[in-house]
């Protein structure tokens, strides 16, 4: 199916959802990863993201994924910015992967990783985003506390560097629980305290925790540093509830922390299509936010 035909069939098959009123407790954004399969199959591309979010789902906030972009050139960013202006959408953050290991044991390598993120700071500022999401990954696989502390020292140097670059542009640098030691909330909190900069924070993801970790307690630990929230969802019951995560319970954790900014839908399920999953997630968040 060609891209235009796909978009037309989508509009016919999935009625557009209403936009969320602005006086609610939080605002809903959409993580571009939710449509990564459609982009990967070339049914749509990154430039379609603003229109799909706004017209199909009534969502204003956009959470971009750098790996889904054609190229981070000035011309490409200008095209994307125009699409956003045309649809009345707003950049929230850019999820950045593949730019190097911020916790690498070789200082030259980790400083190169920090430098690699600078272009995304510039692009985030151009698109009106408040943050770039980075990773605290390393070439080391630390097991004991002393080894973890060493990796945290490496990460702290890298994040101090990129946060210093990002501060004049008023861009935050945020860490998601995204595999490795970042899936341990206590380790992430240690890094937050070690860097201790106002534009360094967390992006708590409702998923991405090992089975042995209590996800609700983990998110509670990350929320004091949160500059965004990722509503990971996998599947929904006939009643519209998420089947893996108790979302009302999780959103109580978020609300109790005093958070009232963007909550990004990130659908990663297989049973529903990407667009059906996003719509189900939007309906659930709207119900909670009513």
Enumerate the predicted regions with their spans.
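Histidine-acidic metal/acid-base catalytic patches
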Residues: 2-58, 182-290
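Metal-dependent catalytic neighborhoods of phosphoester/phosphodiester hydrolases
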Residues: 72-78, 110, 274-277
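Active-site acidic/histidine proton-transfer and metal-coordination neighborhood
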Residues: 10-27, 51, 83-96, 100-204, ...
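Catalytic-core regions built around general acid/base machinery
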Residues: 76-86, 162, 218, 250-253
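Short acidic/polar active-site loop segments enriched in Thr and Asp
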Residues: 60, 90, 130, 260-261
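Residues that line or immediately flank small-molecule/substrate-binding pockets and catalytic motifs
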Residues: 32, 66-69, 98, 136, ...
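Conserved beta-strand positions in the central sheet of alpha/beta enzyme cores
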Residues: 61-63, 93, 133, 230, ...
């Amino acid at each position: 199916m060609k891209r235009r035909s796909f978009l037309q069939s989508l509009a016919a098959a999935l009625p557009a959802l209403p936009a969320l009123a602005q006086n609610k407790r939080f605002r809903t954004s959409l993580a571009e990863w939710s449509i990564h399969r459609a982009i990967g199959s070339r049914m749509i591309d990154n430039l379609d993201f603003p229109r799909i979010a706004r017209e199909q789902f009534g969502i204003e906030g956009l959470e971009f994924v750098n790996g889904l972009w054609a190229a981070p050139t000035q011309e490409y960013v200008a095209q994307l910015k125009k699409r956003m202006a045309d649809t009345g959408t707003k950049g929230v953050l850019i999820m950045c992967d593949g730019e190097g290991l911020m916790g690498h044991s070789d200082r030259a390598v980790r400083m190169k990783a920090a430098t690699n993120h600078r272009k995304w700071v510039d692009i985030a500022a151009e698109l009106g985003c408040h943050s770039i999401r980075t990773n605290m990954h390393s070439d080391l696989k630390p097991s004991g506390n002393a080894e973890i502390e060493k990796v945290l020292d490496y990460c702290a140097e890298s994040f101090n560097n990129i946060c210093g670059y990002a501060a004049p542009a008023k861009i935050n640098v945020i860490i998601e629980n995204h595999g490795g030691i970042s899936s341990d909330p206590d380790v992430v909190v240690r890094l937050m305290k070690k860097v201790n900069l106002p534009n360094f924070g967390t992006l708590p993801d409702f998923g991405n925790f090992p089975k042995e970790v209590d996800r609700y307690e983990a998110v509670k630990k990350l929320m004091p540093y949160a500059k965004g929230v990722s509503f990971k969802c996998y599947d929904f019951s006939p009643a519209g509830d998420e089947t893996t995560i108790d979302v009302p319970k999780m959103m109580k954790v978020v609300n109790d922390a005093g958070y009232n900014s963007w909550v990004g839908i990130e659908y990663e399920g297989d049973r529903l299509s990407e667009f059906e999953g996003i719509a189900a997630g939007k309906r659930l968040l709207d119900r909670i936010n009513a």
